Amino acid sequence: MRFSLITATLGRVEEVRCLCVSLSKQTFKDFELYIVDQNEHHELEDIVRNFEKNFIIHYIRSDVKGLSYNRNIALRMCKGEIIGFPDDDCYYEVNVLQEVNEAFSSREEVGFCAVTTRDTVTKRVCHISQKAYLYKKDVLKACTSIM
């Protein structure tokens, strides 16, 4: 498995469905998605079932609220070489995983990369002036929290 993606969610249903739709359209298919559901309701279970035929998706219920706590639940289960943390209100352009894979494949020393993002509400784009890489030797120094 190349990528493991972890989304901890609370209070969002339609947004998670949009994320799953975007992942089902990826040009790079070697990934799995973990949905860690902190909601009181069980509406996301049906969404997960609807996407099981498109890609590997794991549904995890959690009664504990908290982003880092719930990401760590899924992190223990991941099989991917590269871990990503898409928010529950984001979606990926069709080639995002392909581009990230190429970034990691082209330079063995790369340990982290970032991509341009767009706020879906304000439509503001956060441009990265150049390819944003963090080398493996610098990852721990640059992180403010470690999971």
Task: For the regions a language model picked out, list residue spans one by one.
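Conserved donor NDP-sugar-binding/catalytic core segment of glycosyltransferases
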Residues: 95-127
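Acidic donor-binding segment of Leloir-type glycosyltransferases
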Residues: 20-61
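Short, flexible, basic/aromatic active-site loop/helix in glycosyltransferases
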Residues: 115, 119, 126-147
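Short alpha-helix within the catalytic core of nucleotide-sugar-dependent glycosyltransferases
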Residues: 20-21, 45, 72, 80, ...
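Glycine-rich, basic loop-to-helix element that forms the pyrophosphate-binding segment
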Residues: 62-78
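The conserved acidic donor/metal-binding loop of glycosyltransferases
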Residues: 87-91
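N-proximal low-complexity "stem/linker" segments adjacent to membrane-targeting elements
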Residues: 1-25
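Short aromatic/hydrophobic "clamp" motif used to bind/position activated sugar donors
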Residues: 83
